[in-house]
Amino acid sequence: MDTDKDKIFLDSQERMVKAITSLEKEFTKLRTGRASTSIVDTIKVDYYGTPTPINQLASIAIPDSSSITIQPWDKTAFNPIEKAILKSELGLTPINDGKIIRITLPPLTEDRRKDLVKLARKYGEDTKIAIRNIRRDANEQLKRLEKNKFISEDELKGFTEDIQKMTDNYIKEVETHCKTKEKEIIEI
């Protein structure tokens, strides 16, 4: 029955890693004061009637810390990309010179920075809750194994401690990610 315990442990670890990966993805979407391709990556463009992500229609570059350039591969994509950026709720104003679309990111206001920090903390807290729920699921599965006499009470205690150590490590990782993101947001 070692395989059941191992499966529970590995499954929990895999799910916790996915939770952290999801947090990292959410953090890339949060605008800090620096330009990032992830700010516009998810904007969908109505391209020949099909909603298409910008990164599938153009090259996106970061020439400096406060601007993004978008160079569509197809000349007919300029106007749809520009419209999609204006329609997005990002508050960005694209400048189309016919060869390239430039977006200059306005500096973040103090209030906007505070809102972004709150949002980052919320994402972090949601991830911690997800990790704790994974721990709870693993502990319940281990208790069932013990109840059905597949593992002893001592083994249950040891495996529960292992799951707790893993949980603590991933919670610390979440806290590190949150602190790093908060510093990025607050930096002017």
Swiss-Prot record:
Keyword tags: Cytoplasm, Protein biosynthesis
InterPro entries for this protein: Ribosome_recyc_fac, Ribosome_recyc_fac_dom, RRF_sf
Keyword Cytoplasm: yes
Top-rank taxon: Bacteria
Principal subcellular localization: cytoplasm
TM annotation in the entry: none
GO MF annotation list: ribosomal large subunit binding
Localization per record: Cytoplasm
Protein's GO biological process: translational termination
UniProt function note: Responsible for the release of ribosomes from messenger RNA at the termination of protein biosynthesis. May increase the efficiency of translation by recycling ribosomes from one round of translation to another.
Protein name in UniProt: Ribosome-recycling factor
Lineage summary: Bacteria, Pseudomonadati, Thermodesulfobacteriota, Desulfovibrionia, Desulfovibrionales
